[in-house]
Amino acid sequence: MTYVDGFVVAVPTDRRDAYRDHAGEGWRLMHAAGATRQCEGWGDDVPHGTLTDFHRAVQAGEDETVVFSWIEYPDKAARNAAAAQIMAAPEMHDLAAAMPFDGKRMIYGGFEILVDTGAAASDTGYIDGFLLPVRDRQAYVAMATRAEAVFRDHGATRVVEAWGDDVSPGKVTSFPRALQLEDGETVVFSWVEWPSKAARDAGMAGVMADERMQTPPEGMPFDGKRMVYGGFATLFQS
């Protein structure tokens, strides 16, 4: 089963190019260790929420931009092996020392794929990213499976839902803190891939107007008031 490491980072806006280059160097190491794909999304349409949002998640300052990213592996065993190899690589120590962002505020975790429909495309131009506090896994999968068809009917090329598996509470920032996670809830890391921002804007309008999205399921399996979401322009992808 495909496994994902998910990340959210606050990057100084004027270090955008440095971050892209840094991600490329990181991918070279990750790919050699067994990762199959990496994608980095630069914050473009990231709203400030009332309770939670991506800015709060990483304590982003006014001079920083939120990045939403992930790395894919064939399975959890491959991910664990890659992590061990990377941590022992001298190049990784150099890369960590040169990070163009505050690593102490980066949030990250490991996730099992629940839903993965469509196909990853080398020309993905835009990403909608989501973090959700989910209480009922089975009900969430059923709801997400219905919804993914609507997104793809309106132009999305891929829809992924991933269930928190190796997600630490963190000391400064973390996925659980970002969602004000409660007992019995699990973090879901999710994204929708689009060919471009124009396709995303048109597609999301279609999704919102689609009759299939007008009737929510009885007993939503997550708290929508604490859901975190935003739109990201693709900055780097392997």
Task: Report residues per predicted region.
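Hydrophobic, helix-prone linear segments
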Residues: 1-27, 31-33
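Short, well-ordered beta-strand segments in beta-rich or mixed alpha/beta enzyme
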Residues: 4-11, 50-85, 126-134, 171-207
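Surface-exposed interaction/gating patches
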Residues: 8-10, 120-158
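Short loop/beta submotifs within extracellular cysteine-rich repeat domains
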Residues: 15-17, 76-79, 92-93, 137-140, ...
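Generic detector of contiguous secondary-structure segments
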Residues: 18-31, 66-68, 139-152, 187-191
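Short amphipathic alpha-helices in soluble, non-transmembrane regions
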Residues: 20-26, 82-90, 142-147, 203-211
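A residue-identity detector for tryptophan
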Residues: 27, 42, 70, 163, ...
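Glycine-rich beta-strand-turn "strand-cap" elements at beta-sheet edges
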Residues: 31, 37-62, 88-124, 152, ...
